[in-house]
């Protein structure tokens, strides 16, 4: 099972100006606020069936509490302490359990004393394979909560769940 890439560009527009006369609002302030809201969001955690099977297969090789949690990952996603530890120690595994967005590119003025008319933030979002991208975009719009920010889809794929009941997968398991 592979998460589905959805790359987005957020663009904020506001009145430009000079750095010596700060405005109440600016494109940079708007884009930073949007980025903070996204970065602070914990998207719903859940395990699709293939990911449940993956964690269950790893569980016997874990110790103590971690073994218990991984053997029933669908329940463990509600345990904040376990999920925090997993995120800190194995972020690639934690990422399998929710939609994610990494803030990757930030653009504003090319001069230190110029407040730009536009500022951009690019996101590398990865969606669970059964997630509807349009529904996710709607959720993101709600999180951003700023109608003046434009969202452009740079790239996105259709959902894809890899089958695990194939001869190749059987050979890998052996």
Describe every region a protein language model picked out.
Residues 60-61, 116, 161-169:
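Short glycine/threonine-rich loop-to-helix capping motif typified by GTGT followed
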Residues 12, 125-127:
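Hydrophobic beta-strand positions in extracellular immunoglobulin-like domains
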Residues 1-8, 19-105, 114, 129-149:
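Acidic-enriched catalytic cores of C-N bond-cleaving enzymes acting on peptides and small amides
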Residues 15-18, 156-158:
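A short, flexible beta-alpha/helix-coil linker loop
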Residues 6, 119-121:
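Hydrophobic core residues within well-ordered beta-strands of beta-rich domains
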Residues 172-173:
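Phosphate/diphosphate-binding loops
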Residues 55, 151-165:
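A short beta-alpha structural unit
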């Amino acid at each position: 099972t592979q998460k589905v890439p959805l790359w987005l560009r957020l663009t904020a527009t506001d009145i430009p100006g000079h750095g010596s006369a700060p405005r109440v609002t600016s494109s940079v302030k708007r884009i930073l606020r949007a980025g903070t809201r996204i970065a602070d969001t914990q998207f719903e955690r859940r395990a699709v069936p293939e990911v449940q099977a993956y964690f269950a297969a790893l569980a016997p090789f874990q110790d103590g509490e971690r073994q218990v949690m991984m053997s029933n990952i669908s329940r463990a996603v509600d345990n904040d302490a376990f999920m925090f530890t997993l995120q800190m120690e194995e972020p690639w595994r934690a990422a399998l359990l929710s939609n994610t967005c990494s803030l990757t590119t930030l653009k504003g003025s090319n001069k230190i004393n110029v407040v730009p008319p536009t500022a951009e933030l690019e996101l590398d979002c990865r969606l669970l394979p059964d997630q509807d991208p349009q529904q996710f975009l709607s959720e993101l719009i709600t999180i951003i909560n700023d109608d003046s920010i434009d969202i452009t889809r740079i790239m996105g794929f259709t959902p894809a769940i890899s089958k695990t009941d194939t001869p190749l997968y059987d050979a890998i398991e052996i």
